[in-house]
Amino acid sequence: MFACNDLQAPLYSCVPSVSHHPLWAPVHSLKGPHSCPSPISSQARCPLLKVLRSPQDHGIDIYSFHIKSEVRSRYAMTVITSRVANLANESREVNFHVEMPKHAFISNFSMTMDGQTYNGVVKKKAEAQQQYDKAVSRGQSAGLVSSVGRTLEEFTTSVTVAAHKKVTFELTYEQLLKRRLGQYELLIKAKPTQVVKDFKIDVHIRERQGIPSSTSADHTSSFPTSQARVLFAPTRQQQRQCPGCGADGLSGDLLIVYDVNRPKTKGDLQISQGYFVHYFAPTDVNRTSKNVVFIIDQSGSMHGRKIEQTREALLKILDDVPEDDHFALITFDSTVRSWKPQLVRATPDNLEAARSFVRKIQDLGATDINAAVLEGVRMLKVFTDGQKTNKTASILILLTDGDPTSGVTNLDTIRANVKEAIGRKYTLYCLGFGFDVNYEFLEKMALQNDGVGRRIYPDSDAALQLQGFYEEVATPLLSDVEMNYAGVSDVTQTTFSQYYNGSEIVVAGHVTDNELETLRAVVKGYSEGNEVKYEDASSKNDDATDAYISDVYIQRLWAYLTVQQLLEKEVLLSGSDKEAIRERALNLSLKYSFVTPLTSMVVTKPEGDKSQVLHKPKEGKQPVSKSTAVLLQFTGPDVLPYPALQSAAFSTVALSISNPLTDGSDNL
């Protein structure tokens, strides 16, 4: 067992200060026996815990608050259990509030009082509303959990607890961890709102490919184990004494970051009980040069900090553009302006001239999105048509903070114009700055053109958010990727316009050939204009005895990914096609008890409680007041041991706490 109990580090361990913003670090798996670790290095990258203060309810004692998360091959199931006692001499209302990642699906909720458990039931939204209305008419209280739009961000319910009685809340949500910039992120939000006697966060990660102890570009090593565990169990005193804490205790975000080992030319193909999942992220591919057009809104609404942060981000991005890339800059208000009439090579002279142009960008005028995007497409078409070979990836990046107010302003017309102009030849990414933008319009336009929409939050780190997005698409490796399998059905998306360095393609499906002993995958794509092919195979017999493959997880992963992709596809359709997609997504949501935009969860509570309807916030809801942040360092060999983090028999991750950040950012 790895343990360093003889080194009892103080709660406020000294670690290097962070001058600008927190950086993220991999979670390291340790397998004992090991010697006690040394202090953390200044190059470590750090996950973030935000501390949010909230009032403690008088007479209400949250005596146990547990968060347990099991991650199997990137699929995470998280269970939050809160046990509460009413110490008062009269009945009190007890609240249960949980925040979760936006792409997670709630799959279970229950309340237990006086030996009686009240379970949530997932239904169609209309049926859920009817059940709620009936419960209210009978004088009962019914909690209604709904998802608005395509996000799941918060869950709140309450129940009246008699004097000296207890209640147990339990909520389960599920998610597929997405690989971004070479790492997976598991976000856990813990907000018990008071100091808790029994506080514990227990995360268990199982990856059969192994978890590297170092994720640097030039060095990757791993321990023999394919498991890692984070066990965070602070005492009451530690919950009070951490920076920014007090009577309200710990309350905030815990971010765990890791990656897996990868053979250079192979993916990871797994089969279990008639379902399969294929993770594909090759590392033996040369970088493909790209053609990129930046389309920047400089209308009057970008006044002040927004335009300053945009300039700052563009200057940083230009510092990182490789010389073999070609690029163009377009700014627009009611008029479209091009820095150059065509795309140019990213030579030092051209980059310096582009920086001079960016420094002079000023806000003025209205917003003509249609003309700006069409001009960007025209420039790309002229440039790519003149290329002798198709060895590059071509993308457009639109940044805007408002609705179109000049030129063509009908949203459907703009989307149709852009889709026709692009013609599946290029990828369009749409970045919406702030909360006044029509995010649904931007997201739909991006999805129609093989891209994604992304919100840029108007906080102190907005420039870093812009840079971070560009980093995700800065290094294309493969284009026109096709994933092919034999003897399968109900397969998720199998074609992808681009595969970028640091990302991962995930495909899941149903194995229909009962005689199939070995599932084979053939992946085709283009690298620098040349076709490349990869092959993966997995034996049902081998996977059946693999301890890292779970029957439940692969099937639920398939259902989760299918529903997510159907909801994206449904946005782009109309008429009978739209209804068919909605029906399939609804049926899967009901079968697997997922709370999605098409379903709601009803919980009928004890008689006499107040009626209550509970909804999820819409995408784009502005964040609440700023918070102080406390950094938790997740490291491997280089760390000061944190007493509240218990060691495990096979692995552990240690924490130490630094000084809080003071810039007030919500999106660090």
Which residues make up each language-model segment?
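Von Willebrand factor
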Residues: D284-R345, N370-E375, K388-T400, P404, ...
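VWA/integrin I-like adhesion module and closely mimicked acidic/polar interface patches used
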Residues: G402-Q448, V452-I456, D461-Q467
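Short, solvent-exposed beta-strand/turn "edge" segments of beta-rich domains on protein surfaces
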Residues: I67-M77, V84-N86, T160-K166, Q498-Y500
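Exported/extracytosolic protein signature
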Residues: R74-T78, L87-V94, I106-N108
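An acidic, Ser/Thr-enriched
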Residues: N108-L152, S158-A163, E170-I295, D459-S460, ...
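Pro/Ser/Thr/Gly-rich intrinsically disordered low-complexity regions
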Residues: M1-K68, R138, I395, T405, ...
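Asparagine-centered strand-capping/turn motif at beta-strand->loop junctions
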Residues: R83-E90, V98-M100
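Loop/turn elements at helix/coil->beta-strand transitions in domains of secreted/extracellular proteins
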Residues: E323-F327, T367, K391-S394, I422-Y429, ...
